[in-house]
Design a protein with these regions (language model features):
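Active-site-proximal region of nucleotide-activated glycan assembly enzymes
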Residues: 100-149
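An aromatic- and histidine-rich active-site surface loop
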Residues: 79-98
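Extreme N-terminal starter segment of soluble prokaryotic enzymes
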Residues: 1-4
Length: 149
């Protein structure tokens, strides 16, 4: 199985990295910001840099949508996993169009309110994971797996 792990650097990337027992034996590639923390964490991984900053930026959305189209058509992942943030949105929507399964994990510090990215990708996510039972009120089809820490 080929896996695309997409997320912002910092805490979002740390959450994805903590899933190592799942992805370590998979054919995989990462999409994240080309920042020092990401580059040092993913030194032995295939990392595709995306455009940032992405916070509610139409320019970033357009650039990263073009990147997602190019990358997803070339790599053809079976599964796209993200913990956010905005860079995940075009990868999830275009990934679904290209037949990929999607899994979104709402970030740990969201206990009872959704992230913008979570709200945007929820409609196209095959498995939506929350880490707090309270978030199931916001995301009824979510699965609460508890903390990934």
């Amino acid at each position: 199985m080929k896996v695309c792990l997409v997320g912002s650097s910092g805490g979002h990337l740390t959450h994805l990295y903590m899933l190592k027992p799942f992805w370590q034996d998979q054919d995989r590639f990462w999409v994240t910001f080309p920042k020092p923390d990401a580059q040092s964490l993913l030194v032995d991984e295939t990392m595709i840099p995306c455009y940032y900053p992405t916070n509610r930026s139409l320019k970033a959305l357009l650039i990263n949508t073009r990147l997602a189209w190019k990358v997803l058509r070339k790599e053809r992942p079976d599964l796209i996993i993200s913990t956010g943030a905005a860079v995940a949105v075009p990868f999830f929507y275009l990934g679904k169009l290209l037949g990929a399964k999607t899994m979104y994990i709402e970030i740990f510090d969201r206990i009872d309110s959704p992230t913008l990215t979570g709200k945007l990708v929820y409609p196209v996510t095959d498995r939506f994971i929350v880490q707090w039972e309270e978030l199931k009120r916001v995301y009824p089809k979510a699965i609460n797996l508890g903390s990934i820490f």
